[in-house]
């Protein structure tokens, strides 16, 4: 039986105490590709909510696929391979700049919300997620940065090469979904990441 005190502590749980110097540098990064706007998202479901517990249980039932998670970890390289497959020109510097500047917004929101990662909530309930541990998973959970960046580049290249829209958007979704398969994100993190990507795409200069 979970005690009220424990539930209150769970609801107050955060990912950590704040941004590292490295992550703060990303938050302070100047912007040149996007309009100077303030982007907001709806808060994530509370840690003690039925929705969050349902998401944790959903993650616990996903079959492990380490290869899929690792293959989709490097966003810039993944899109480079798809360009190469279709013999399309790929400006790696441009892609890198979009990833760097989008990370400013991602990090701002991650540290604003400070949502715990799924394994932190799962541990409270005694649920073993058996997730994949990668260096790119060392930030607060909400929103998913991979979902944001995968969908952002997917939309940019779909606009540029509309005949390959299906393939670019599938790759963007694979990058986003790989973080769910790796148990690194809640499905609601992915949804918020896609919403952020759409806002960034719409506010390009």
Where are these regions (language model features)?
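Charge-dense, intrinsically disordered terminal/linker segments
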Residues: 1-13, 202-205
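Hydrophobic alpha-helical bundle signature of multipass membrane enzymes
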Residues: 13-181
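Generic structural signal for hydrophobic core residues of well-folded globular domains
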Residues: 157-160, 200, 204
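Interfacial helix-loop-helix junctions of multi-pass membrane proteins
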Residues: 174-202
